[in-house]
Amino acid sequence: MVRNKEKGFPYENENKFQGEPRAKDDYASKRADGSINQHPQERMRASGKR
């Protein structure tokens, strides 16, 4: 059985954490101060249209 941590395993996408995050603050369910974002249905609909 071959494991992913095996020596010499080819990592195809080493840079998967680089670049912009997929989730934007505009579509987050909670704000940075911990309050809940209003109108969740509109927020989720807008997130799907991007």
Swiss-Prot record:
Induction: Expressed only in the forespore compartment of sporulating cells. Disappears after 45 minutes of spore germination. Expression is sigma G-dependent.
Stretch list, region Disordered: 1-50
Gene Ontology BP, a term: asexual sporulation
Subcellular localization(s) per the UniProt record: Spore core
GO-annotated cellular components: endospore-forming forespore
Keywords: Sporulation
Main subcellular location of this protein, as a coarse class: other
Annotated InterPro entries: SASP_SspK
Basic and acidic residues biased stretches: 1-33, 40-50
Similarity comment: Belongs to the SspK family.
Protein name: Small, acid-soluble spore protein K
